[in-house]
Amino acid sequence: MDYFENVPKVQYEGKNAKSKYAFRHYNPEEIIMGKPMKDHLRFSVAFWHTMTEDGSDPFGDGTYQRNWEGSTPMETAKNRVDAFFEILEKLGAEYFCFHDVDIAPQGDSLKEFLENIDVMTDYIKGKMDKTGVKLLWNTANMFTHPTFVNGAATTNNADVYSMAAAQVKKGLDVSKKLNGENYVFWGGREGYENLLNTDMNFELDNLARFYQMVIDYAQKIDYHPQFLIEPKPKEPTKHQYDYDAATAMAFIQKYNLEDSFKLNLEANHATLAGHTFEHELNVAKNYNALGSLDANQGDLLLGWDTDEFPTDIYTATLAMYEVLDFGGIAPGGLNFDAKVRRTSFAMDDLILAHIAGMDTYARGLRAAAKMKDDNFFEQIIANRYESFSSGIGKQIVENKEDLESLTNYALSLNGVENKSGHIEHLKSLLNDYLV
């Protein structure tokens, strides 16, 4: 069955494209800074928002028109995989991501769930072998089921901790089976609702123990992915332990996990944490921990995770600048952790939304590459910190000064003269790269 029979394969047609099923900016084979655009961006489609959402919200029923529902949960699961790989083929997307519960019915027991995962990953592997599509990352959903009401690896219940371990073990087995390039941990329930009954230090110690078990098991099965922690400050838990990039890195460093873990950063999660997306990427870059991106955007007027498809060229440009400055995102990628709006309920909206996101990041990549070629930010930063490139500043950087010598220097000064940052002018110059 063709699920999108009225949608052609999406091709690059340029800014004057007449078809809505065309890329106007994403040209996969276009060479930018020495390699094809597709290799810079490494686009991935998220199974969960694409295939399992129905458009419902707390105030209304689902609106999405979908044609893959079967007569049994397993039939529906296989239909979804068929439709999903058709979407990947239409878009020319080379990667995908999923949670375990996205692809397999959970059944009535852990045993049945794990068996269903085996069946469905066999089915998915067949599709991968046929199409050449690759798994960017998979993860275990340990936040939806009532079992995880108090967390998974930070739970107060040792039985629940064991259930989480079993689910992640299967996730690692699956990732090896499908040759996943990364494995993600997002702790939606790893945090606390009320500090009055929480031993935070104990919970974080247990979380670190869990991650060490993950490292040990991966070595045992000779599987070496890039492990990624995905920060988010809140939602669904009031206070989540992986609040933002800096908090996650503090945890990683405290427990000596730097050799195994980097960060998967999401734009909307940055918004919820009170940061820009580029801030989070810059923090991760400075720790050498920029692992992968969830390319979406939030609504600055709302206080929750709206997971919109990215259309903000300004944010995409600054994000891609950080990626280029880091030397690239591989083995990570840009995963569209985004869902179509409730009013975008037609089947082809799934294709159109991904086209919009892919075009947006293609424009961001082009602009960021031009800025790198022009040394735009490099010159600005060099000028701002030039006092540390000679004289007393250079002496400070070379660790040749101390408090006493700097005091003597300060006393010899006849006042201090600061330079204007000209920030409005710099923003105006940045805008010139975006048109």
UniProtKB/Swiss-Prot annotation:
Family classification: Belongs to the xylose isomerase family.
Annotated GO MF terms: magnesium ion binding; xylose isomerase activity
Summary of subunit composition and partner proteins: Homotetramer.
Residue positions binding Mg(2+) 2: E266, H269, D305, D307
Swiss-Prot/TrEMBL cofactor(s): Mg(2+)
Gene name per UniProt: xylA
SUPFAM superfamilies: Xylose isomerase-like
Cofactor note: Binds 2 magnesium ions per subunit.
Main location: cytoplasm
Positions that bind Mg(2+) 1: E230, E266, D294, D337
Protein name in the entry: Xylose isomerase
Lineage: Bacteria, Bacillati, Bacillota, Bacilli, Lactobacillales
Catalysed transformations (reactions): alpha-D-xylose = alpha-D-xylulofuranose
Active site, UniProt feature: H99, D102
InterPro entries, per database record: Xyl_isomerase-like_sf, Xylose_isom_bac, Xylose_isomerase
This protein's GO CC annotations: cytoplasm
Subcellular location: Cytoplasm
EC number(s) given by UniProt: 5.3.1.5
Keyword ATP-binding set for record: no
Domain of life of the native organism: Bacteria
